[in-house]
């Protein structure tokens, strides 16, 4: 029964299933993609499935990877929109945690994952990591994960990002389309292999993020009737000995380094450092161990005559 196969086995052993049981496996995957059956992908992460395509722009659609992607758990269901700013520069090609996935796989996977779950005007969209950021429309493909990866790869750019321009792009989109406040992203998530810096320079100019910039941008949003999205910056390839998440003096959530805990935190959109700390230390694994009560031993003293 292929519906009982564990998540990771579905990802790793699909070639073996096709080699030894091709007809039944293909029929099962076809039924899954039609919504008639379920495939188990509950313990997989988005980047693991994207990495299965080897990030090849000419990759053919893989029914197994498509089925696993469609059946990923929705960790943000009912929550606010999250829009990703994805770094596609060459340095993002480094592998993460000695695994097969790359930082680029993480960025593209989360950009697609959150874009699919956003509602309204920002559905199926993410933003390029650029000094002239633009909205990428993933719906221009045929709807498959493979086509969305190809679209993302075509928009890779080697540049620093202009954070003010990102906020302005979102506000401009909201005003142009007369969006309701709840249709705007609640969080802007920047995925990169760079350290967060208030100043960024390229070959042409330098751009500095001033401490009062959020006040200026916030006023623009307020004047238009909107709430300013919060900003989170994840340095996926950080090798510094910093704590996993902290908040700087401008209120930006800074996530450092790659781990499954960091992925869980980002997918749940719980980016408040204090909340993350409390959630971590209150998990079952850290609860005190209570040993069963035992009766005290009776000591018998023998006196010599």
Descriptions of predicted regions:
Residues 1-106, 116-305:
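Long lumenal/extracellular ectodomains of secretory and single-pass membrane proteins
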């Amino acid at each position: 029964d292929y519906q009982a196969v564990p998540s990771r086995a579905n990802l790793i052993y699909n070639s073996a299933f096709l080699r030894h049981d091709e007809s039944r496996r293909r029929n099962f995957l076809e039924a899954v993609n039609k919504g008639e059956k379920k495939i188990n992908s509950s313990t997989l992460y988005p980047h693991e499935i994207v990495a299965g395509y080897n990030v090849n722009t000419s990759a053919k659609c893989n029914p197994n990877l498509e089925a696993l992607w469609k059946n990923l758990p929705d960790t943000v269901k009912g929550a606010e929109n999250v829009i990703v700013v994805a770094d596609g520069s060459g340095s993002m090609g480094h592998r993460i945690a000695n695994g097969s996935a790359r930082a680029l796989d993480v960025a593209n996977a989360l950009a697609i994952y959150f874009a699919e779950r956003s509602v309204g005007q920002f559905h199926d969209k993410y933003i390029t990591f650029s000094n002239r950021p633009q909205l990428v429309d993933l719906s221009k493909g045929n709807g498959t994960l493979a086509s969305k990866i190809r679209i993302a790869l075509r928009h890779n750019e080697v540049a620093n990002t202009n954070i003010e321009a990102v906020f302005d792009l979102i506000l401009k989109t909201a005003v142009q389309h007369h969006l309701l406040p709840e249709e705007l992203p609640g969080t802007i998530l920047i995925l990169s292999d760079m350290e967060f810096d208030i100043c960024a320079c390229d070959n042409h100019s330098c751009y500095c993020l001033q401490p009062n910039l959020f006040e200026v941008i916030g006023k623009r949003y307020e004047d238009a009737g909107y709430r300013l999205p919060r900003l989170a910056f994840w340095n996926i390839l950080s090798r510094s000995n910093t704590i996993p998440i902290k908040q700087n003096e401008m209120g930006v959530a800074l996530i450092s380094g790659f781990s499954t805990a960091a992925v869980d935190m980002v997918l749940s959109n719980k980016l408040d450092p204090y909340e993350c700390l409390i959630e971590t230390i209150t998990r079952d694994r850290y609860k005190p161990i209570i040993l069963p009560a035992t009766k005290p031993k009776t000591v018998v003293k023998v006196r010599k005559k």
